[in-house]
Amino acid sequence: MSAPEFTLLFVTVAVGSLFQVSIGFGLGLLAAPVIATLDPSLTPVVVLLLATGVTAAVLALEGGHADVRGAGWALVGRVPGVLGGAALVAVLPARQLAFLVAAVVLTGVAVSLRGFVPRPGRRSVLLAGLISGVMGTATSIGGPPMAMVWQRLSGPKLRSTMSGFFLAGSAMSLATLAATGAVHTDSLRYTALLAPAAAIGVLLARPLSSRLDMRRTRAVAMVLAVASATVLVIQQFL
C-alpha cells in the first residue's frame, strides 16, 4: 500500500471512528469499502479489530446507559449470523466479497433514508442481530440493522447499547474468523498502524458530539459511505 493510499485510509478510519462514537455506527460503513478497494485481503478483520477498540471506549464512557436486555437478545440472534458470515468469507473470492461489501453499504443507506422504524421487540431485535452477525462477520458492516431497530433510543442509550452489542459481537466474529484462518499477520500489522487514527476519532468525538447536528452528521456519513461503495464497485471493473 502506497503512502497516499495509507493516508487516505488513516483519515477514513479517524472520521469513521468519530461517527461511530457520535451516532453509534459509521466505522465499518466508511472504512470497509476503502479497505476493500486498497487491499481486499484485509477485509473484514482490520475493521472488526479497530471497531472492538472504539466500541470498548464508548462503553467505558457511557456504559451505564446500555439496554442490557435488548443487547442480550441481539447477541442471541448474532450467533448463527456469525457462522453464516464466516462461511461467506471462506468461500467467496475477493472480487465477490468486494461486491458484497458495496451491496451491504448501499442497502444500509437506502433503508436508513427511507426512515423505516421497526418496533424494538424481542423478535425484531433477534432478527436484526442475526442479519448484523452475517453482515458484520462477512463485511465488517453490522451497524445498519441495529441502528434501525434501536433508533428510537436516546443518544447515550443508543450509543452504549450498540457499543455493548458490537464489543461482544465483534469478539465473536473475530474468534470465528480466526478459527477459519482469516486473521493473518498483515491484518494485525495494519490494525496496529491504524489504531492511532481510531484513537484520534474517539478523542475528537467527545468535545464535538455536543456541537454536532446529528441529522447532518448522519447525512454526511451516508454520502461518504455511498461514495466509498461506488468507488469500490468501479474499481472492480478497472
Language model features with spans:
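Small-residue-mediated transmembrane helix hinge/kink sites in multi-pass secondary transporters
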Residues: 32, 86-90, 206-210
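Interfacial loop-to-transmembrane junctions
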Residues: 202-227
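Cytoplasmic-side transmembrane-helix entry/capping segments in multi-pass membrane proteins
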Residues: 69-78, 98-102, 120-131, 157-164, ...
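Juxtamembrane boundary at the C-terminal end of a transmembrane helix
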Residues: 231-238
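Small-residue-rich hydrophobic segments that form or flank transmembrane alpha-helices
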Residues: 6-72, 129, 136, 143-202
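Membrane helix-loop-helix hairpins that form the core translocation module of multi-pass transporters
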Residues: 41-113
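Residues within membrane-spanning alpha-helices of integral membrane proteins
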Residues: 6, 45-48, 101-105, 109, ...
